[in-house]
């Protein structure tokens, strides 16, 4: 079966009752319109009850104003503005708190996937409360690949989380998970924290290989030295704090609507 036919079969076979897209944005004026257009097109294939949450993390390039214009045009879109830059973790926590639908799909605003590939994740929700992507076809150079391998290995050894691609910004999950976990990260450790907390609470995590595309607009800061240092500091802080917090186990998986 071709990939295109597989997508259409998934659409017919499985949908979601409702879905919130969450896009964290900092100086993404070159990507925001595409995010909304593609989320609307793909989201309508997944559900009839859709919202798109754009989190403007104190952008300086006009991204926030453009997001507001898109919200005026499309009732599915709502925009959250930070008066001060709070980095990825702060932006995602704001977006997750603003999401109101049964399922949440977090994707980076540089759109590292073909949006319709999200349809391939929907059938996996029959047996998992969270579906995460792992990148296929990465071409970021040996330095980034080594950093990624070391980071994933650290997370596995320190926290017992065995997934292939902790930091890939494709995570589809039940919003009810957020009621049972605690997220504190303000930086890029948020991806690992979300997965670790979900795993510790007993929820099921499925993995989906996804084609990866380099950004075509805007500037990534994930590989910068300051970001890496902040991730390591937040990891150490999290490990210390986690030892003091009780673990809340997951309820029985809900019946699928």
Model-derived regions, located:
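Hydrophobic helical membrane-anchoring modules
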Residues: 1-19, 158-161, 184-257
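Short loop->beta transition adjacent to catalytic acidic/histidine clusters or analogous donor-positioning motifs
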Residues: 16-19, 40-54, 62, 75-78
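Short, well-formed alpha-helical segments that are part of the catalytic scaffolds
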Residues: 28-43
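Acidic helix N-cap motif at the loop->helix transition within catalytic regions
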Residues: 30-34, 61-70
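Acidic donor-diphosphate engagement hotspot in glycosyltransferases and nucleotidyltransferases
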Residues: 35, 63, 92, 116-118, ...
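Conserved donor nucleotide-binding strand/loop of the catalytic core
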Residues: 50, 64-98
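A conserved acidic beta->alpha catalytic loop
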Residues: 56-65, 111
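Acceptor/aglycone-binding surface of glycosyltransferases and processive sugar-polymer synthases
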Residues: 82-98, 103-106, 115-188, 215-234, ...
């Amino acid at each position: 079966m071709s990939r295109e036919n597989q997508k259409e079969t998934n659409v017919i076979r499985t949908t979601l009752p409702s879905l919130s897209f969450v896009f964290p944005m900092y100086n993404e004026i070159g990507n925001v319109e595409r995010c909304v257009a593609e989320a609307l097109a793909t989201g309508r294939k997944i559900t009839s009850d859709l919202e798109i949450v754009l989190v403007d993390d104190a952008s300086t390039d006009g991204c926030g104003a453009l997001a507001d214009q898109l919200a005026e045009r499309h009732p599915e879109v709502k925009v959250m503005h930070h008066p001060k830059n709070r980095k990825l973790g702060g932006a995602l926590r704001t977006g997750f708190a603003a999401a109101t639908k049964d399922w949440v799909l977090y994707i980076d605003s540089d759109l590292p996937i073909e949006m319709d590939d999200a349809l391939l994740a929907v059938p996996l929700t029959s047996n998992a409360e969270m579906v995460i992507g792992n990148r296929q076809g990465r071409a970021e150079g040996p330095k980034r690949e080594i950093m990624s391998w070391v980071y994933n290995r650290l997370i596995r050894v320190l926290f017992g989380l065995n997934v292939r691609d902790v930091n890939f910004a494709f995570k589809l999950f039940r919003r009810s998970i957020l009621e049972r976990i605690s997220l504190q990260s303000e930086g890029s450790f948020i991806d690992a924290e979300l997965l670790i907390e979900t795993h510790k609470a007993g929820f099921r995590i499925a993995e989906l290989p996804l084609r990866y595309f380099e950004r075509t607009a805007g500037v990534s800061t994930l590989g910068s030295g300051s970001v890496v240092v902040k991730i390591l500091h937040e990891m150490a802080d999290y490990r210390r704090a986690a030892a003091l917090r009780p673990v809340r186990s997951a309820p029985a998986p809900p019946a699928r609507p």
